[in-house]
Amino acid sequence: VNPEELKRLVAQAACDEVLKLPPGQCLGIGTGSTANWFIDLLAPHQGHFAGVVSSSVASTQRLIQQGFYVLDTNQVTDLPVYVDGADEINPQGHMIKGGGGALTREKIIAAMAKRFICICDASKQVAVLGHFPLPLEIIPLAEPYIMRTITALGGEGRLRMVGVTGQPFITDNGGWILDVHGLSITQPVQLEAQINQIPGVVSVGLFAQRKADLLLVGGPTGVVAVAHSQ
């Protein structure tokens, strides 16, 4: 089964899951290629929901094109479910996210939501997190200090650049992204707390304190659902 077909299958499974919600509620939607499948497949059922909150400008544009009513996070007090992908996920449901650069907004919406449904294909499942570079959103003026601190933690920080321009990648919030290579993250909850304490770090792409409640993973045999308790 090709990767796109796996993404479509898990996105369809997530649609089936969220349509179990009573009508008239809000839904959180993430960012990335699998989330895009989810948006497109859910579009015919948008009337079931009062509105959606989105983790990025890119997802918001796609949602509006598909006719969804997109709400600002400040307008929403009750968010039953957030659906998003992951760059890596371990057997405990801890994730690395933020490969697309939207980690801060993803983290805010994940914290607001009662349930986090992670959708991905089996290639994202790992025993230990860290092979995928861990993204940090940072305040630009803190970059040299954060870089030194990350080196002391045993990681190699690389500032994310845009194409051939040699300019730093700018997030939707005006921050920079530091991708940390070379970490073997055996203690994700502790590392998340440790990195969050570094002055100038806006957020870290470790979703361990708030992990996935339900993983829908696409593999050769179809979609497998794995529940995790917080």
Question: What residue ranges belong to the model's regions?
Answer:
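Active-site catalytic microenvironments in core metabolic enzymes, especially phosphate/sugar-handling
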Residues: 1-26, 31-78, 210
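Conserved phosphate- and dinucleotide-binding cores of soluble alpha/beta proteins
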Residues: 2-9, 57-230
